[in-house]
């Protein structure tokens, strides 16, 4: 769960899966899978993947605010 939080936050900061994956030294598909796992756990998408750069969904905004509080 901790890695998922770290990965979601990196994608949020970079607004890009590719840039976040490079920053984290992992493959983009692995990062995408971890974010999908986090989304499954909360039951909702975190990112709107139809926009460039990525934007947060309403649930994603709440998730990121929660992460910021615990970091």
What annotation goes with each model-predicted range?
Residues 23-24, 35, 42, 63:
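Core residues of bacterial helix-turn-helix
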Residues 39-56:
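A short LG(V/I)-centered, amphipathic sequence patch enriched
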Residues 1-3:
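Short, basic-rich loop-to-helix N-cap that marks the start of a DNA-contacting helix
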Residues 5-12, 57, 64:
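Hydrophobic residues on short alpha-helical segments
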């Amino acid at each position: 769960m901790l890695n998922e939080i770290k990965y979601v936050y990196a994608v949020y900061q970079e607004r890009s899966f590719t840039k976040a994956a490079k920053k984290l030294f992992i493959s983009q598909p692995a990062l995408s899978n971890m974010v999908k796992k986090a989304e499954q756990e909360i039951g909702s998408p975190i990112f709107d993947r139809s926009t460039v750069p990525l934007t947060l969904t309403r649930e994603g905004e709440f998730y990121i605010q929660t992460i910021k509080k615990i970091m």
